[in-house]
Swiss-Prot record:
Cell compartments where the protein resides: Cytoplasm
Keyword terms of this UniProt record: Aminoacyl-tRNA synthetase, ATP-binding, Cytoplasm, Ligase, Nucleotide-binding, Protein biosynthesis
HAMAP family: Glu_tRNA_synth_type1
Record-given protein name: Glutamate--tRNA ligase 1
GO CC terms of this entry: cytosol
Family (UniProt): Belongs to the class-I aminoacyl-tRNA synthetase family. Glutamate--tRNA ligase type 1 subfamily.
Gene Ontology annotations of biological process type: glutamyl-tRNA aminoacylation
């Protein structure tokens, strides 16, 4: 097999969405697993709709996801002279020609064909034209498509594809202003960049026969094609922003980890037995584009959250703390971090929810859960006062297990049911039910902050 060269070629008319990142991932995995090259090309020929911000977001998304590409980014907008050279080559070899039909003539032809219940298409009137060109018309350039036979190719996912040549007219490869069209620049660039395998969404399937015509006209070897089915929502419809079709960096801002996103995406259309968790190294070892499913995949947000929680749970706490800094989480001493982080990991499926849980512990409550508060024992403040007296004298240790033993001993000595003492402390320290354990909270907050919160709660209770 030749050295594998793949590419990802987004248009910078919008942000890179989740489906685009999946396509990039499939190309990346196939190239890297086979010791090949993975290239990035920005298809920015639509000068009116291009956005530098979108281009930056695409590259930022790659950096965030950890998908490195080889060489420099190729920008199609910087290659117009190159494309014109190949258009001229086709004109000189009589494989393309100037078409002088006006917009009015094209509209009239289309209306006539629709009236006769024919498929609208160009009628090849200038295909073999040798006369004098009409005045005042800036011509387009059309390629000579086959008039008979079939255009065939083997798709790695969909199998053998055959299109009747009569379904494709002499399509435009250069507009009247001289700018090349999408299918032309894609075919030329894929050939010149040495792309051996084109893995892309099946919304590009209809472009493939036209690109093959261009390949053949220029004498370029065809790459292998893999057209990946789309990602659909749970109702089987095209993914919308409401379903999850957001920019990749939106997921970063929502607190998703790149490892979770890549794991989620690789399973949308590919599987390896019943295995669900894949590190990037495992993906590189196991992924094969020939095993991609031919049916669309469904976006499942619950599955993504489950994966994200898995990667948060098993992430090194030091690295996790660095990432959480982007979400307003302050650093803790190592001893306190090693108590609080494991307690929050089991309750957090995004970095945002982790940060929220962190702040709920580290920031004193502004209010108290009323339903929880009114259920407390009538002697609650008395217990808390007595506990603070004992805490003040106790040798405090930042160890939840030692604190738990101490609280049990305190409850036993004061004839308090531990099942009543713990909710009282939780309400005073955190202001609500749920969250991390009381002993973990006491250990992380330390004796001074814990006592301050307890006395604040006692004052609140006494003033009601």
């Amino acid at each position: 097999m030749d050295k594998i060269v793949t590419r990802f070629a987004p248009s910078p008319t919008g942000y890179l969405h989740i489906g685009g990142l999946r396509t990039a991932l499939f190309n990346y995995l196939y190239a890297r697993a086979n010791g090949g090259k993975f290239l990035l090309r920005i298809e920015d020929t639509d000068l009116a709709r291009n956005s530098m911000e979108a281009t930056k977001a695409i590259i930022e998304s790659f950096e965030w996801a950890g998908l490195d590409y080889d060489g420099e980014v190729v920008y199609q907008s910087q290659r117009f002279d190159l494309y014109k050279t190949y258009i001229q080559q086709l004109l000189e070899s009589k494989k393309a020609y100037y078409c002088y039909m006006s917009k009015e003539e094209l509209d009239a032809l289309r209306k006539e064909q629709e009236k006769n219940k024919q498929t609208p298409r160009y009628d090849n009137r200038y295909r073999d034209f040798t006369g004098i060109p009409p005045q005042g018309i800036q011509p387009v350039v059309r390629i000579k498509a086959p008039l008979e036979g079939n255009i065939e190719f083997e798709d790695g996912i969909k199998g053998q594809i055959s299109i009747n040549a009569k379904e494709i007219d002499d399509f435009i490869i250069a507009r009247s202003d001289g700018t090349p069209t999408y299918n032309f620049v894609v075919a030329v660039d894929d050939a010149l960049m040495g792309i051996t395998d084109v893995i892309r969404g099946d919304d590009h399937l209809s472009n493939t026969p036209k690109q093959i015509i261009i390949y053949n006209a220029l004498g370029f070897a065809l790459p292998r094609f893999f057209h990946v089915p789309m990602i659909l929502n749970s109702q089987g419809k095209k993914l919308s922003k409401r379903d999850g079709a957001m920019g990749v960096m939106d997921y970063a801002k929502m607190g998703y980890l790149p490892e979770a996103i890549l794991n989620f995406l690789v399973r949308l259309g590919w599987s390896y037995g019943d295995k669900e968790i894949f590190s990037l190294e495992e993906m590189l070892e196991l992924f094969n584009p020939n095993e991609l499913n031919s049916s669309p995949s469904a976006y499942n947000e619950d599955k993504l959250l489950w994966l994200n929680q898995h990667y948060i749970k098993y992430m090194d706490n030091t690295l996790l703390e660095q990432l959480l800094g982007h979400f307003g989480v302050t650093k803790l001493s190592e001893s306190k971090r090693e108590i609080l982080y494991p307690a929050l990991k089991d309750r957090s499926n995004t970095l945002v929810s982790f940060a929220q849980g962190f702040n709920e512990v580290m920031n004193a409550p502004c209010s108290y859960d009323e339903k929880m508060r009114i259920k407390l024992d009538a002697n609650a403040t008395q217990w808390l006062n007595e506990l603070c007296k004992n805490l003040n004298m106790a040798s405090w240790e930042d160890n939840p297990n030692i604190i738990e033993s101490y609280l049990h001993q305190f409850a036993l000595e004061h004839q308090i049911k531990i099942g009543k003492l713990m909710p009282t402390l939780r309400c005073a320290l955190l202001g609500k039910s749920g969250g991390i354990g009381v002993c973990e909270a006491l250990a992380v907050l330390g004796i001074e902050e814990s006592m301050r919160r307890i006395y604040t709660f006692i004052g609140y209770q006494n003033n009601i």
